């Protein structure tokens, strides 16, 4: 029996309070309005950005259904939807691509003005919500809310992908892989023969390593305080791995000594102000580029000496690896299907959706790279 046009009751992981476990609740998911799409979720990755919300470092309205890295199948569409249809395999896009705003029309940028990232309302683009739990409205997260068996997104925030793609793997293209890989190949534009430093070896950091290798970097120095991640980093392309706790001097000084004055490209993939500064300082003062990839704590500022940039350094950041989401995600999935890169090494744990709290515990303890939840 078709569910199109009807309210669907399903299970979702609701965050009612900060620093508390998720609660698996029965929620009602309203049908999609015009230019919206309702998706049956198949697989969702647990990303550090979701944990930043739980810990209070990333602010979004509560109660909320988190999750933003996922893949699923279109259940139904609202009036006027033309780019996807029921039955299509899709990836929701936490960075939409409306194609009409100033940012979308700029070939060098991807931070579409329809996003709900910078000053989140916790709604879809029309300012309303599609989730309720026992009659209480529940907020959306960055327009996608993938920790639910069903979700509703705007049409400009979903991409149709190859019908043969394995959703439990390509879900990582919805955030972690694309964010890291694109930061190297598209944002920094790593050059052949260059030297790179990558701070943080989670799923996104390892994807940066993969991007540096694909771009032809000669040296890729991986930096993390968890030595258990070094073997995986080397498997994916790191030429050296170092632990800042093994040195008495600041890690940026160690890296400068290792690289004749500094690396060509550095990446901060943790979200800490101290490592952002170390990443900037370790790149060469005359020609280095440092990229902020990790999500920084809310409402905290860095103070720097402008001379660090005057000498020739470049300091930049990007969301989603600089990729324009709706047009790039299908291409990235096609590249995966053509075996241009593998995602297997990034997925360390697969758990049923109901064990979401266990998955977050694995992330917090550093025992997982990516945990994928299956529905």
Curated annotation (Swiss-Prot):
Enzyme Commission number(s): 1.1.1.1
GO BP: retinoic acid metabolic process; retinol metabolic process
Catalyses which reaction(s): a primary alcohol + NAD(+) = an aldehyde + NADH + H(+); ethanol + NAD(+) = acetaldehyde + NADH + H(+)
SUPFAM superfamilies: GroES-like, NAD(P)-binding Rossmann-fold domains
Residue positions where N-acetylserine is found in the record: 2
Cofactor (UniProt): Zn(2+)
UniProt cross-references to Pfam families, sorted A to Z: ADH_N, ADH_zinc_N
Record annotation: effect of changing residue 272 to Q: In allele ADH3*2/gamma-2
SMART domains: PKS_ER
Effect of substituting residue 350 to V: In allele ADH3*2/gamma-2
GO cellular-component term (any): cytosol
Keywords attached to this entry: Acetylation, Cytoplasm, Metal-binding, NAD, Oxidoreductase, Phosphoprotein, Zinc
CDD domains the UniProt entry points to: alcohol_DH_class_I_II_IV
Enzyme class: oxidoreductase
Subcellular location: Cytoplasm
Residues involved in Zn(2+) 2 binding: 98, 101, 104, 112
Residues holding Zn(2+) 1: 47, 68, 175
Sequence similarity: Belongs to the zinc-containing alcohol dehydrogenase family.
Function: Alcohol dehydrogenase. Exhibits high activity for ethanol oxidation and plays a major role in ethanol catabolism.
Description of how the protein assembles with itself and partners: Dimer of identical or non-identical chains of class I alcohol dehydrogenase: ADH1A, ADH1B, and ADH1C.
Note: There are 7 different ADH's isozymes in human: three belongs to class-I: ADH1A, ADH1B, and ADH1C, one to class-II: ADH4, one to class-III: ADH5, one to class-IV: ADH7 and one to class-V: ADH6.
Descriptive protein name: Alcohol dehydrogenase 1C
Gene: ADH1C
